[in-house]
């Protein structure tokens, strides 16, 4: 079994500002900090560097409470992501927050509109659609593993883990191949605007640039598809209605941004984290090779372990008590999903990477009404890429340091250099 540094709680930083510092998320040990908070104050009042306070929720029970009661905890009033600075907390300056407060994107809607919008989009992510898509995903996975083996050495993040989900979502959306690199670059910038490798100027400027670029692209493409709709996801956006009213251009563009950006994060980062842990824990790799049935439970442990979406922001719509604390209407609450997924009261040996973990009620895909629309697709991709990996890869090892993305929203990877060896082929 593999254990990480978060299992040892020592020398903890005292400054709660670390909770939203993108560079601490990249290089620090947040799991140690969260473990202490779960013990001492799982509902804890915290100040941002720009003076706005919020309730920090770190226990599984409290995070799940937020998901199970979308009426009391609004995703729309102030958006669903904790702003990094005062500018990003100002809807006059932040395009993403302004659109969020309009309910332009699916995850930033409250009932009943959230359910209506979700039903308008979900066809491409239902079991029947995924069954039809599976041969494409399987062939893609085999090709990516084959290309990796042909190189011998590669950057697993950008050569495999990022290409798998981006190619799949671009296929579902029927994005022209010549535009993939542009959209991938803008998605990285929008998801991690504070990372110097992705950002371009200030955090606010980088985020606004990315959103504007992808929105404009999706809106223009949707106008073309509306005239002659097909079976692709852009055509769905172009022709969808909510309560009989067509989506606005902003709603089409912002949901397109969601599919392009968020559609990549879970698989890319869970897969990289999972492979990294299998390298560090050869007993788990041997266990998987001896029992391929573990491919059914492995995807959820990959997601639990990394928790690609670290948190969601909610706004209290009424006065209430939560975890012994008095919450007032209008208060912000930040539910730390990554902390909930290591809660010692829910998961046996939570700091142990266990590909056969059962049960595994992690919240990495959200829960209830806000269960990730692409959750089943992410599981399919992880299962298929690992099937191809087991079939074709004999050995994999790190050849350098793993580099993490500087983001307080997504627990991501930038680079993971590896060396791989192909399995010997037996010729009858």
Q: For each predicted feature, which ranges?
A:
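Cytochrome P450
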Residues: 1-428
